[in-house]
Amino acid sequence: VVSALVNRRGHLMVEKIAARLPAQDELNLNPEERHGDAGDAEVVVIGMGRAGFAAYQRLTDHYRLRVAGVDSDGPRIQRLAAEGLRVIEGDATDLYFWNQLRRSDSVRIAVLAMPRHGANVTALECLRESGFSGKVAAVARYDDEVQWAREHGVGIAFNVYAGAGLELADQV
């Protein structure tokens, strides 16, 4: 019983303990532990794989929005940074990441573009717990995932396979 209570809010205990520890020089920290900086981004795209990359490109090129990507894959981040994209290294399923992320009030949209539904669910929970109150969009592979996302406050939930089918038909 006690462990169930502790596990449910364990991150709060960790935060309280961490607040009492001395500050660390960021250069000495593991890159995943450093503060991310979204700068003046209006949109944060979480997961910079194929779907996230496409969303990032469309949001910047077509809609002229300021976007920051988030990913945990170091080589992918380096490749995207070399292409001129702003990508933050971090684990979006970790509440610590969201609490450490430097973001201005300009961030008003979060796009959950990770391939696993469970990761998007956890990232959504962390995003909400960190105080984010903007719009959330999410990709999903299955209709039940789209339904779950909508039931949990995701304003735009999109089935990637349905979208691919529509685009394919438009190209024929």
Regions found by a protein language model. Give the residues of each.
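Cytosolic regulatory regions of ion transport systems
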Residues: 1-172
